[in-house]
């Protein structure tokens, strides 16, 4: 066994918070059964304690340990089994009724739990080693993205180190191959409700379940709180604005674009991402961190296609645009106060 795997699992078993790679983004990880360790996650991230975490489990885990079967109808079981067969392990998180034994600190005080099994060998190996050390199969790792709350998620080990320095031990598992957070689907009503867009699309969910999922804009307020659902999120410190492709050449010194029919030849601080949603998502957060490092007045982002394949990327960038302006405003207020 890789000694780093054992070290990671040992640190988790001892109640430490570490950073682990997944196929989506790097996570700030703690033993989900250790409420003190989970509290450290919230403190390190400056994350509100009512903002629930995703619990990551092994590919062959018994979900019966984590969920309240008495609140699972036959239809909820059917949906759960179908989606797990298709996407566990993978970039899908399921929201289900929480078993009373699960500490409320992981779930933000809610009676639901968010479960995912990462499709990442290093993470799965850490889960297996943690189970061996603790001598139980019922292990879970709580792991939100390894960044300060509301900021750009990390997809490389160096992103985490830049965020937390020596305060967090990082297990380097190379770059995240998907690059954005998992799709979150709430099954507690017996109908799939997408709470966060991700790599798994609404069409994917319909194909597997036979049901057209309810999209976020069609829901009321009676849905569980979940990671990444705030209006302002995933944000750099530099203000971001949308722009059409034809206007980017005229307005931009720092830009993020994808069109194939032009190039920003004279703009060293422009990044072109692939002109497809999967490739764009894979490079998005690394590109935002790079552009943010230029400390420009603004980052101009080329508008994206409106089809389903781009839902998740558009969602992240829409929230980043809002969050970047809030971040810039707060930063200016701090500067003004320091000058008084």
Map each language-model feature to its residues.
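Active-site-adjacent structural elements in enzyme catalytic cores
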Residues: 1-340
């Amino acid at each position: 066994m890789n000694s780093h795997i054992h070290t990671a699992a040992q640190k988790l078993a001892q109640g430490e918070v570490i950073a682990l790679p997944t196929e989506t983004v790097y996570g700030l990880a703690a033993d989900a059964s250790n409420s003190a360790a989970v509290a450290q996650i919230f403190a390190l991230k400056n994350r509100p304690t009512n903002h629930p975490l995703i619990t990551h489990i092994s590919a062959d885990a018994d979900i019966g340990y984590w969920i309240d079967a008495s609140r699972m109808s036959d239809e909820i079981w059917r949906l759960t089994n179908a989606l797990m067969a298709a996407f566990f392990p993978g970039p899908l998180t399921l929201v289900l009724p929480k078993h009373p034994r699960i500490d409320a600190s992981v779930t933000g005080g809610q009676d639901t739990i968010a479960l995912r099994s990462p499709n990442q060998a290093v993470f799965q190996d850490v889960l297996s080693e943690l189970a061996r050390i603790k001598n139980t199969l019922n292990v879970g790792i709580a792991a939100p993205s390894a960044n300060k709350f509301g900021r750009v998620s990390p997809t490389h080990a160096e992103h985490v180190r830049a965020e937390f320095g020596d305060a967090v031990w990082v297990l380097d598992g190379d770059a995240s191959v998907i690059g954005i957070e998992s799709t979150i689907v709430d099954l507690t009503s017996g109908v799939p409700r997408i709470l966060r867009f991700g790599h798994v699309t609404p069409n994917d969910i319909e194909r597997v379940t036979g049901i057209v999922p309810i999209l976020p804009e069609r829901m009321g307020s009676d849905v569980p709180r979940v990671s990444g659902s705030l209006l302002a999120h995933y944000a750099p410190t530099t203000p971001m604005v949308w722009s059409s492709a034809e206007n980017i050449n005229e307005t931009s010194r720092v830009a993020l674009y994808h069109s194939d029919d032009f190039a920003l030849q004279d703009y060293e601080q422009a990044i072109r991402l692939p002109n497809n949603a999967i490739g764009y998502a894979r490079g998005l957060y690394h590109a935002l961190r790079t552009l943010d490092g230029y400390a420009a007045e603004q980052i101009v982002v080329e508008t994206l296609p409106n089809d389903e394949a781009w839902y998740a990327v558009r969602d992240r960038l829409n929230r980043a645009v809002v969050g970047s302006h809030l971040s810039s405003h707060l930063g200016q207020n701090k500067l003004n106060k320091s000058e008084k």
